[in-house]
Amino acid sequence: MGCIKSKQECNLHKTIRLKRNKENDEMHNKEKVCLVQANQEDSKFCSCTASPLLLEYAHRLSEDIVNKAVRQWAEVDSKYSDIPYIESDAV
């Protein structure tokens, strides 16, 4: 009795898994179609210019990110600068 019941449950799980795989494939195909359509529309209407205000903001933001990264690197480097680097010939 247990064997028959487990086989029935196994078939049910297999059916559910197949349905999910089919739904995932359909969603993936729809996403691809949307991306292709969006790329085609973008290429038709792209003026390829950005506003100077946006460019200035992006430039300031990138400088800020770089400055923070350099500061963070300097802090970490100063913490561990007293630890000597040991080279090893073992490879």
From Swiss-Prot:
Any Pfam family: SmAKAP
Location in the cell: Cell membrane
InterPro entries: Small_membr_AKAP
GO molecular function: protein kinase A regulatory subunit binding
N-myristoyl glycine: lipidated positions: 2
Modification(s) after translation: May be palmitoylated at Cys-3.
Annotated keywords: Cell membrane, Lipoprotein, Membrane, Myristate, Palmitate
GO cellular component terms attached to this protein's record: plasma membrane
Domain of life of the organism encoding this protein: Eukaryota
Similarity comment text for this entry: Belongs to the small membrane AKAP family.
PANTHER family, A to Z: SMALL MEMBRANE A-KINASE ANCHOR PROTEIN
Annotated function: Binds to type I regulatory subunits of protein kinase A and may anchor/target them to the plasma membrane.
UniProt name for this protein: Small membrane A-kinase anchor protein
Organism: Xenopus tropicalis (Western clawed frog)
